[in-house]
From Swiss-Prot:
The gene is coq7. It catalyses: a 5-methoxy-2-methyl-3-(all-trans-polyprenyl)benzene-1,4-diol + AH2 + O2 = a 3-demethylubiquinol + A + H2O. It is a peripheral membrane protein. This is 3-demethoxyubiquinol 3-hydroxylase. Catalyzes the hydroxylation of 2-nonaprenyl-3-methyl-6-methoxy-1,4-benzoquinol during ubiquinone biosynthesis.
């Protein structure tokens, strides 16, 4: 693939992340369950808030993976980031479709989330591959944690959303492990705490808007 073709592809990915229209390569988990069977209006609203948070997380993931691929010094690391990024694109599409089924919308602040995450990912990538991969691993660890919390918060009757979140959780564990296996190092605790605090702001805001 030529550099121009690659640039066009990455721009298309960024546009689909921010504006919508992501395409999944894998079937949507939970498709065997009825869309909103047994879920009342209040539960749908709550589930939509949680799935909007998850969608924002995937918007941020796309920005992080794209920016880090740009500055990765190793072709194998670029390939690993590309593979994980495609699975994150599946997550993006699943969450977007589920929000539509729930009669809701993605976050109105997606351009802001994407831009901020791209800048952070670029900075992590410029620090060197081991720190970049460590950042990926820590990010996936924190995402896994909040997905587990969502499985406890989602209505039990919303089997469709729960199936999506559970598969996302499984994938995030694999992505984090792949980053560690590729040479990622543990981040200093202060950085982990800052990441957690920033994540808290994002999840609280995205639940509503």
């Amino acid at each position: 693939m030529s550099p121009i073709d690659r640039l066009i592809l990455e721009f298309d990915t960024a546009l689909r992340s921010v504006v919508g229209g992501a395409n999944a390569q894998r079937p949507t988990p939970g498709s065997e369950f009825a869309s909103n069977s047994g879920v009342d209006a209040a539960e749908r609203k709550h589930a939509a808030g949680l799935m909007r948070v998850n969608h924002v997380g995937e918007v941020c993931a796309q920005a992080l993976y794209q920016s880090q691929k740009l500055v990765a010094r190793n072709s194998e690391i670029q390939a690993m980031l590309d593979y994980s990024g495609q699975e994150e694109m599946d997550h993006l599409a699943w969450c977007e479709n589920r929000l539509q089924e729930l009669g809701s919308h993605t976050s109105y602040l997606n351009p802001l989330w994407y831009a901020g995450s791209f800048a952070i990912g670029l900075a992590a990538g410029l620090a060197g591959d081991k720190w970049s991969l460590g950042f990926v691993a820590e990010t996936e660890k924190q995402v896994e944690s909040h997905l587990e919390s969502h499985l406890k918060k989602l209505p039990k009757e919303d089997q469709r959303s729960r199936a999506i979140v559970d598969q996302m959780r499984i994938d995030e564990i694999a992505h984090g492990q792949a980053a560690k296996n590729a040479g990622g190092v543990n981040l200093p605790e202060p950085i982990q705490k800052i990441m957690h605090a920033m994540s808290k702001v994002m999840t609280t805001t995205a639940y509503k808007i």
